[in-house]
């Protein structure tokens, strides 16, 4: 019976995609799909299952009202979705903070760089073509795919039709975010004409070689090879163009550096600045006046963020992140992540980003 339902659901999505004449709506224009305020708290979805959960039923009515798909099809979808306790257990694990010297070893070491060189050589023509068109160096695209999924070898095997409902209704701390991503996912399956149960990804709902969330997929994924599908799972041209499109949309500047080493005395004022939220809130000229000396040429008018990397226990190197640093940071909100992308990119491309 489940296979029958899944097959019927796939037909519904395919027909909806074929009949649609409207362009994809940018993610920021999608209505908020957070659940209505309930007079009494609903029983946990872990106890009720999706179909019997009051919050899920409100979501179904809401999505049907928005025209995502019919209420009957949504009921079928949730009847087949499986609540995954292991996903909630993963999300509830305490977070760990690693210093740069450990993060670098695990994410941007020699093995990862060598893998990036092989990946680049294998797909050099299309990677260079995408780089020329979008202005994002090929080695940066390679580095992101390398960190995210080890060049496509570990894209995740969770069905998004299980993981996203589980997080949307079983993880209250970020329930609103994941309900929005579930909304985007249902629209994505409809627009792509695919059975929603055919999509796989990480436990948190990230998909493909670049690990796009559904909202990012809908807005920035690109069908670069022209086959009618935005295939971020198996088409390197689509993957490269999608990542480049994301970075360009978030402000990547052709020919710009990512970060520059600096010389400075770590005064309380500068350490407080390092601890501030990542943002381009100072100019290089202002940082010079505060005692920060760039060790490479950079214009005073450029915006920058001051940060440090722990190279050994208690030992630090200091840097300023520039515009392109911030563009990559918006892909993953971690200064260590951006630094690892740069490390791999420099190792693959032989440059000094």
Predicted region positions:
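C-terminal motif of bacterial Sec signal peptides marking the signal peptidase cleavage site
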Residues: 14-17
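N-terminal export signals and maturation junctions of secreted/periplasmic proteins
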Residues: 37-61, 68-121
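Flexible, glycine-rich surface segments
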Residues: 196, 200-304, 312
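Acidic/His-rich structured neighborhood in mature extracellular/periplasmic domains
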Residues: 98-242, 248
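C-terminal functional modules
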Residues: 304-353
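Bacterial N-terminal signal peptides that target proteins for export
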Residues: 1-7
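Bacterial signal peptide processing site
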Residues: 19-22
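Solvent-exposed loop/turn segments at secondary-structure junctions
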Residues: 82, 148-152, 206, 253, ...
